[in-house]
Amino acid sequence: EDDFIKSINAKVAYTDYRHSELEVGIVGTTFDNESLEARVELLHQDFWNWRGGLSVHYKKSDFTAVGAEAFTPPSETNSIALAWIEERHFGDVLLQLGARIERTEINADKVRLPEIELVSNEHDHEEHDYHDDHDHASPATQGMTRNFNVSHVFNPTSLSAGLVWDFTDGYNLGVSLSHSKRAPSASELLSFGPHIGTGFYEVGALFALHDDHGETPHFGLTDEAVVMETSNNIDLSLRKFKGDFGFIFNAFYNEIDDYYYEQATGLSADAGHDHSGHDHGDHEEESFTLPVFAFSAQDVTLHGFEAQVAWQVTEEFAWRVQGDIIRARLKSGGELPRTPPARLTSEFNYQGDRISSDLFISYYFEQTHTAAMETSTDGYIMMDANVNYHFNLGQHDLAVYLKAENLTDEYAQVHTSFLKDLTPLAGRSFALGIRGSF
């Protein structure tokens, strides 16, 4: 009992994930991500009324993309982090402290800077044909195809502090402050090619667009240092957690310097050949273009509000309503793309001896705060429901269920999706099944 270490927890996970992106039934690119992750937590005995401990987190990820439309090179990411958390009560006030230091290393071989033809989205190819004959290459295309190795090391750190005040029975107020850094991912740095999953020609932050002095627009290696995201955040909360009626209200404000996101360039690039299967003749292949989006590190602000109210009406019936809204803006002016719209949801639950049921009604507001080259998204209402009948079969618990989604057959687009215009949410659907635990 006098030992300093109270408990040790360890977790190890190995994942070998693979998926393929299809274009009209043809595999365009196969992604393979093999990762090993380990975490060890050491909790100490209480000393001077402090509770907490240390944790060590290690992760290794090997990523490859193979195919005609592989937009990122093979890369290896290694990270190891040491974190510390502590908390202590001072009367009705709980003080929480935390810190984290990390080392992240990104290595990639065969990073490509290919020669591509860029055209303005405001004009067609005939008006702006930047492709010259091979015997008379333009300055913008000379030497554009290059291969090189990349190695970057980042040392992000994080600090946090919070107070929770139980100012009366069943209620508390909370405030938390945090300062954190994040290393960019391999895809945010190294991407260069067509990405079917987003419908963009993606270019990583390691490359910069050059279009000054009357030159033909082209990409080259950036002259700027690769930076980490730096965020400063404040959260305020009010909770009621005792009794049949409760609520949580939370407001937050976050300033992020060098926030990585995909920014529209106003240009398009040749993305390869058409795989639609149309007959273009024996010696003719039709190419297509995609809008070019480049990862950019910009200073942004995010602020918003979240609320949740829950009421246990009777022993069998419960009701919950919650909503959230967020604004995300560039400090230089303008909106961040693909910001979620305001949302309001209501949930009704019934739990009987044998029968349980749920009804979900969600209202997504119209999103009109859009970035350049981004369209607004109409609001919509989604209604889902399910009914379950529970029974026993021997020693096993089983349930027959009927599930219905999008009961009103609403046409709905997800504003946060890169492909919202091509892949709306599914229409009305029903599922009947049985589930159990053995």
Predicted regions: what they are:
Residues 1, 38-44, 82-88, 161-165, ...:
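Residues on the lipid-exposed face of transmembrane beta-strands in outer-membrane beta-barrel proteins
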Residues 1-166, 174-178, 240, 245-252, ...:
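Face-selective signature of the C-terminal outer-membrane beta-barrel domain
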Residues 8-21, 166, 172-174, 178, ...:
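Membrane-embedded beta-barrel scaffold of Gram-negative outer-membrane proteins
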Residues 14-18, 58-64, 90-92, 101-107, ...:
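Transmembrane beta-strands of outer-membrane beta-barrel pores
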Residues 86, 164, 172-178, 319-325, ...:
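Conserved C-terminal beta-signal and adjacent last beta-strands/turns
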Residues 106-151, 191-222, 263-294:
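Solvent-exposed loop segments that connect transmembrane elements
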Residues 252-256, 260, 264-370, 389, ...:
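Gram-negative outer-membrane beta-barrel transporters
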